[in-house]
């Protein structure tokens, strides 16, 4: 009977001790958490106050804030007519003084093929004014190829330019292809026939297409 009472007493003491230890430990943890949280809130509050004070001091000492306010009309005038633009428009360009607008160029296309030559004169709008080839100049079949036929074709085109009085001021010469006809056209422009238009030539271009790979070409034409 005495043993039974001692066991119950020890059990109740153990239970009460565990509950009290849990209570006190939780209380200590709560107090620690509360103190840490209060310190964090204090640090956050201090940082916010410091940043507010710093921003106020910065804005109070900034030159842009203390600068006098400009009117809207003056701002619009400065944006619409800047000094650099007004200076550029006021000062005349010495290169362009005494010169009119540059007229649009005419185009002379010389397609120099192996068996024929095509020369076309185009307006600044790229419309055909006159064209000539071996057939229009009276050459037939194999006679359309060669130096003489190309020279005759070019001289006929230059003659038509002189007859029609087109008033060409600028001329672009564009070559297509490599053959004897190309040399003939060049010599005709540099010769007596091209004296009328030679001073008007401002640009010479070569637009010969160059083939890189691709499919097999057509068979060679035989006349």
Swiss-Prot record:
One of its GO terms (molecular function) is structural constituent of ribosome. The keyword Ribonucleoprotein applies. Residues 1-38 form a transit peptide. Component of the mitochondrial ribosome (mitoribosome), a dedicated translation machinery responsible for the synthesis of mitochondrial genome-encoded proteins, including at least some of the essential transmembrane subunits of the mitochondrial respiratory chain. The mitoribosomes are attached to the mitochondrial inner membrane and translation products are cotranslationally integrated into the membrane. Belongs to the universal ribosomal protein uS11 family. Component of the mitochondrial small ribosomal subunit (mt-SSU). Mature yeast 74S mitochondrial ribosomes consist of a small (37S) and a large (54S) subunit. The 37S small subunit contains a 15S ribosomal RNA (15S mt-rRNA) and at least 32 different proteins. The 54S large subunit contains a 21S rRNA (21S mt-rRNA) and at least 45 different proteins. This is Small ribosomal subunit protein uS11m.
């Amino acid at each position: 009977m005495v043993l039974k009472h001692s066991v119950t007493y020890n059990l109740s003491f153990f239970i009460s001790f565990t509950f009290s230890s849990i209570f006190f430990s939780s209380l200590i943890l709560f107090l620690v958490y509360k103190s840490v949280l209060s310190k964090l809130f204090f640090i956050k509050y201090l940082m916010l106050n410091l940043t507010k004070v710093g921003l106020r001091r910065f804005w109070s000492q900034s030159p842009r804030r203390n600068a006098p306010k400009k009117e809207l009309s003056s701002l619009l005038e400065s944006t619409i007519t800047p000094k650099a633009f007004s200076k550029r428009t006021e000062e005349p360009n010495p290169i362009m003084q005494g010169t009119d607008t540059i007229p649009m160029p005419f185009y002379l296309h010389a397609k120099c093929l192996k068996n024929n030559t095509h020369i076309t004169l185009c307006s600044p709008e790229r419309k055909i004014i006159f064209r000539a080839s071996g057939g229009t100049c009276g050459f037939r079949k194999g006679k359309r190829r060669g130096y003489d036929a190309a020279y005759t074709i070019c001289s006929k085109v230059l003659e038509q330019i002189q007859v029609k009085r087109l008033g060409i001021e600028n001329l672009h010469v564009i070559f297509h292809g490599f053959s004897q006809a190309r040399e003939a056209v060049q010599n005709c422009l540099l010769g007596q026939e091209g004296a009328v238009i030679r001073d008007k030539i401002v640009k010479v271009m070569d637009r010969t297409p160059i083939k890189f790979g691709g499919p097999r070409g057509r068979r060679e034409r035989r006349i």
